[in-house]
Amino acid sequence: MIIGNKLESINEINELNLNKFPEQLFNISEENEVEKFLDSYPADFYAIRDKSKAGGTFKLKVARDDVLNEIKGYSLFTINVSSANYVDNQLLVGEIEFLSNDEVYATLSIDPTASVRDALSNPSFNFKTNIFDKRLNDIPYFDYIYKYISDNNLYDVVVEFALFDKGVGIKDEKIIVYELRTHY
């Protein structure tokens, strides 16, 4: 699997039928479509992500009434139901990669208010190790995460995710996948 950019990541998440928050990709002139999305997936907060470039502007917690104002200036962006709606339910967030040679890279946060970006800048766990390292047992729910990666054959892929204490997202599962990366 080769994923070279954010659009390919979205496509791969969809093709693999992985759990995600309701999300849609929009262009600058699609305000009517944005309103339809908001009506279809009512929530207190939405996340807006610039998809025109890696590391683009990201707003995690935008109130529904502010979304149309916030998207001004974006040329290509996604809107999704925000994890901020589930701050009381988030257990773990960050990114993890299990390589086929048994190496493991994990940058994770147990802060329930953290985003993936927060986890990367202020992690509770930051390991570059192998699958046999006993320190991995210190990561809450590590076995659950590993089983998810294995069940979905996500080896050799950086998986940005969050784990919740209840089912969330379009598949009502405990793990949400935000992004998959291999070559960017």
Located regions from the model:
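Nucleotide/phosphate-binding sheet-loop regions of phosphoryl- and nucleotidyl-transfer enzymes
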Residues: 1-184
